[in-house]
């Protein structure tokens, strides 16, 4: 989808002369659309950002940012309060920007309000999983693929969703496909089997279920940066919604040391050195070194944003957020009502189709019975014709016998006996004819009755077809969801302008703190641990895939994940473990890595 917008505004005149300012063409790519704008040379990053969110109807702006490729080829987030032209955007026409999630929620089910927000997160996370930016084990990949199919195609329909239907859909990481000796048809069948489990699930609900599973993956929502400690050991710093984590160079799945945001009171950097001051003033500063000053700037900005959202989640919702949630509830209720109408319409249609099929089967049976009755009637009529012919022959013989009676006086007694026998035979024949005529009449009556029944059934079939047409119309009406317009709002982020370039300069930021905040990791459990059905699904998938697994194709992450599972670790158990002990002990542990 391409949306073109013109944000040019009329410039004032000075001394009677119109001052024409230079305009720039920009293209902003979201996860499912391309937006094109013409902006002024004075347009700031925030003005461009506001134009984008207004165009797509997004109000949960605090999660998102505009990303661009700078002159050095690195991905950089646009600075909101600096002119677009003055930022190090790669010189192209149009200028290229990507609208992406910059910060992730702690819990998607609790925080994501708008459907557009849900969709953007879903598409971004799905893309990260498919490209292996986020590691996802094979069994989870297949289950997520089934939710992705539900989100895209709706309910499985065995009539239209036949073999090969998913051939053009990108559903699994290439790594997972390469690691298993399965054909495309076998992968498709596996995904379609689980897809059928999601029947009647709304597309938005399928996206939410996808994200609820994905957020338990170890690499979900983590921004990684290469750093070194004082000893010069190469490590990874992970910044996410829950805090800061330290990883060894060859393992980005399993953090070794963790610091929740609630323990940090100040962050700063000087040149390549980054300093984190804990709330515990007895603890030493947590210090590391980045390869370039610009990396420290990005770390600082991400720390500030994530910490801001971390604290905001633990405060009462603002009026704007309360209104958004109320509106979202209304929309969800309306959608639920539409869903119920749709289900009723579907059920009515199924009943009508079933009844029509029953009528058609019954009509076919009646027609077969009628054909049999017609054959019986023809046979009876032929028998009557033969019996009548025999009766005529018998009467002719009797007449001839009476004419010769005088000549046969000597044989009178014998002839009389013969005559009596013929009379009995005649009566018997007449009785047989009458019985057959009665049988024919009975069959004819049955045929007439069947004919009436057939006409009645035909009327019922027509009525069933009419009801089916009404049900189809109701189904079409029920499947048309009302659209709501969302008014974009201005959102002022606290990301201040930092020093330009890679030059020196000390930058320090105090963070809002609250010593009474409980670490959310303490009670956090993965969805698979809380949901027995999901746990069983993943277990069954893992067993199925094990039969075709090619262990020679395992990656380093596969081996790390398998070892973590063997030791009973998951994302939240690991985070709880690495946050144990006081801050000083963890800082010392980092210095000794």
From Swiss-Prot:
Subcellular location: Cell junction, Adherens junction; Cell projection, Microvillus; Cell projection, Rhabdomere; Cell membrane
Keyword Mitochondrion listed: no
Compositionally skewed regions (Acidic residues) per UniProt: 490-499
Single GO MF descriptor: actin binding
UniProt keyword annotations, A-Z: Actin-binding, Cell junction, Cell membrane, Cell projection, Cytoplasm, Cytoskeleton, Membrane, Phosphoprotein
Disulfide bond entries: none
Span of domain FERM: 24-314
Location of region: Disordered: 477-571
Subunit structure: Interacts with Mer and arm at the adherens junction. Interacts with cytoskeletal actin at apical buds of microvilli in the precellularised embryo.
Protein name: Moesin/ezrin/radixin homolog 1
Species annotation: Drosophila pseudoobscura pseudoobscura (Fruit fly)
């Amino acid at each position: 989808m391409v949306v073109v917008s013109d944000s040019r505004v009329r410039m004032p005149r000075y001394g009677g002369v119109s001052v024409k300012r230079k305009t720039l063409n920009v293209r902003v790519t979201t996860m499912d659309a391309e937006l094109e704008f013409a902006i002024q040379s004075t347009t700031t990053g925030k003005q461009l950002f506001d134009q984008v969110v207004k165009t797509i109807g997004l109000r949960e702006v605090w999660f998102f940012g505009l990303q661009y490729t700078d002159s050095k080829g690195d991905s950089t987030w646009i600075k909101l309060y600096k002119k677009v032209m003055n930022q190090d955007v790669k010189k192209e026409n149009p200028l290229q920007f990507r609208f992406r999630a910059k910060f992730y929620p702690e819990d998607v089910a609790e925080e994501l309000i708008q459907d557009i927000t849900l969709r953007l997160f879903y598409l971004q996370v799905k893309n990260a999983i498919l490209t292996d930016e986020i590691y996802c084990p094979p069994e989870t990949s297949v289950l997520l693929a089934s939710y992705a199919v539900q989100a895209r195609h709706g309910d499985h329909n065995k009539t239209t969703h036949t073999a090969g239907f998913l051939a053009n859909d990108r559903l699994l990481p290439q790594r997972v496909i390469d690691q298993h000796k399965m054909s495309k048809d076998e992968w498709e069948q596996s995904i379609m089997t689980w897809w059928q489990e999601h029947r009647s699930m709304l597309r938005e609900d399928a996206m939410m279920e996808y994200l609820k599973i994905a957020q338990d993956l170890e690499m979900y929502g983590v921004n990684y940066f290469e750093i070194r400690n004082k000893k010069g050991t190469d490590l990874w710093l992970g910044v996410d919604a829950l805090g800061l984590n330290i990883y060894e160079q060859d393992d980005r799945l399993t953090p070794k040391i963790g610091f929740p945001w609630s323990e940090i009171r100040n962050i700063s950097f000087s040149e390549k050195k980054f300093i984190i001051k804990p709330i515990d003033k007895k603890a030493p500063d947590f210090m590391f070194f980045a390869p370039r000053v610009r990396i420290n700037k990005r770390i600082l900005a991400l720390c500030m944003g994530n910490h801001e959202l971390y604290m905001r989640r633990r405060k009462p919702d603002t009026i704007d957020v309360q209104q958004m949630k109320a509106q979202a509830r209304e929309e969800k209720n309306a959608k639920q009502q539409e869903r119920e109408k749709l289900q009723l319409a579907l059920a009515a249609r199924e009943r009508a189709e079933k009844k029509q099929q029953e009528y058609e089967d019954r009509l076919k049976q009646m027609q077969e019975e009628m054909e049999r009755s017609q054959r019986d009637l023809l046979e009876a009529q032929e028998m009557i014709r033969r019996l009548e012919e025999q009766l005529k022959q018998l009467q002719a013989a009797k007449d001839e016998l009476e004419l010769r009676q005088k000549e046969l006086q000597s044989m009178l007694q014998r002839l009389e006996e013969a005559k009596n026998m013929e009379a009995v035979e005649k009566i018997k024949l007449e009785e047989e004819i009458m019985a057959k005529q009665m049988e024919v009449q009975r069959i004819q009556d049955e045929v007439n009755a069947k004919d009436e029944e057939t006409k009645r059934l035909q009327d019922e079939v027509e009525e069933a077809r009419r009801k089916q047409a009404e049900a189809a119309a109701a189904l079409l009406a029920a499947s048309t969801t009302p659209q709501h317009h969302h008014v974009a709002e201005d959102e002022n982020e606290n990301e201040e302008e930092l020093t330009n370039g890679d030059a020196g300069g000390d930058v320090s930021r105090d963070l809002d703190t609250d010593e009474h905040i409980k670490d959310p990791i303490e009670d956090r459990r993965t969805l698979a641990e809380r949901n027995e059905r999901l746990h069983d699904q993943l277990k069954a998938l893992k067993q199925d895939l094990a039969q075709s697994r090619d262990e020679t194709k395992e990656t380093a992450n596969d081996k790390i994940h398998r070892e973590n599972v063997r030791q009973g670790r998951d994302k939240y158990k690991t985070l709880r473990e690495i946050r144990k002990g006081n801050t000083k002990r963890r800082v010392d542990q980092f210095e000794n890595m």
